[in-house]
Amino acid sequence: MKYLNCFISTGLAAFFLVNSTSVLAADCSSDLTSGISTKRIYYVAPNGSSSNNGNSFNSPMSFTAAMAAANPGELILLKPGTYTIPYTQGKGNTITFNKSGKEGSPIYVAAANCGRAVFDFSFPDSQWVQASYGFYVTGDYWYFKGIEVTRAGYQGAYVTGSHNTFENTAFHHNRNTGLEINNGGSYNTVINSDAYRNYDPKKNGSMADGFGPKQKQGQGNRFGGCRAWENSDDGFDLFDSPQKVVIENSWAFRNGINYWSDSSFAGNGNGFKLGGNQAVGNHRITRSVAFGNVSKGFDQNNNAGGVTVINNTSYKNGINYGFGSNVKSGQKHYFRNNVSLSGSATVNNADAKSNSWDTGPVASASDFVSLDTSLATISRDNDGTLPETALFRLSTNSKLINAGTKESNISYSGSAPDLGAFERN
């Protein structure tokens, strides 16, 4: 199942027209663009100058000049390439997005021609500076597409604003979490984005997650079609977050492995950490996959609220599903149509059925076309969606086909939903 621009209103979903040309495309396999029109384009290149007018790539502005000039409904169009942010030892070099777009008229920042604009903050491997985020998004209604943030001195992106969208973005090799939402950030959408190899030297890997909608994050934050792998701590970390987070069609794998030769390494290694600190967070995760994580694939982590867990697959984690902690009175987890393979599942205080460890059929390797987990890191499809491979797809004669329970908002093609993250068509 593809998640192309999921969660986003129709007007924004296909992205935007740019003077009826094809410098941007909703689907990079075609030259077509559709959606809404921008009021103004600011052309930006790595060698751009504040003295240029930014009317074309022949006279590109600098990124900072374009940010200062851009208004709601306007586009900062980035020439693909590397935008190097100078590093000075002991000092931060954050880019702050503190102005705001408007509902229906965000400020767009996007790479041209389906390319990638890489913002390299240049921090050496062992160096970090407190709060030296790469992107610090305090404003509202920004729309980022085709952007990468790497080697930031702390979080790759730290989001406290609201109604922002990150599409087909990547956050990697930063000195803390790839993308974190905190301190009131609400109604942010992260779609078809990757976070990998983030590590915090400050605390020996115990803080750097892939994606972190945590603590004081506000309501309405959603993730779809995202991957988080080989981060020093967790893939997705919803620690101490009472506001509901929705995660769909996302993958978390090989988190918590010491790739940094840190003799004091302290990463946790959960795929999806779905709570913490006894906060009551009624999060929802569907159609997602966890494998090869050091600790747990799907982790309650002392969430005192009931979590909804539907049609997920967990394989060869330390523990596949860890939901053994108590919840507050009146709270209960909801588990349906999940698969656990080559690992244990502990699910207490739950309304649970049609899972492979309870009333559903027991899963085995023969139920799947492939368990080759190297397929998880191949390139995304041209439209930015996760690659459609044989990994964890059900085999023709799998006993997991049509073995699930019908659920609202869970589509299926047979007489009933299949078990696991991927419906066999």
From Swiss-Prot:
| Keyword Secreted carried by entry | yes
**Can you supply one Gene Ontology CC term for this chain's record?**
extracellular region
Query: What does UniProt give as the signal peptide span?
Result: 1-25
Q: Where does Ca(2+) 2 bind?
A: 402, 413, 416, 418, 423
Active site: which residues? 273 (proton acceptor)
> Which terms are listed as keywords in the entry?
Calcium, Disulfide bond, Lyase, Metal-binding, Secreted, Signal
The EC number on file is 4.2.2.2
Q: What class of enzyme is it?
A: lyase
Cross-referenced Pfam families: Pel9A-like_beta_helix
Q: Which cofactor does it need?
A: Ca(2+)
Catalytically driven reaction(s): Eliminative cleavage of (1->4)-alpha-D-galacturonan to give oligosaccharides with 4-deoxy-alpha-D-galact-4-enuronosyl groups at their non-reducing ends
Localization in the cell: Secreted
Which pathway does the database say it acts in? Glycan metabolism; pectin degradation; 2-dehydro-3-deoxy-D-gluconate from pectin: step 2/5
| GO BP terms | pectin catabolic process
Q: Which positions are annotated as binding Ca(2+) 1?
A: 209, 233-234, 237
Give me the disulphide-bonded residues.
28-114
Q: Which family does it belong to?
A: Belongs to the polysaccharide lyase 9 family.
Q: What does this protein do?
A: Presents an endo-cleaving activity on polygalacturonate or partially methylated pectin.
Protein's recorded name: Pectate lyase L
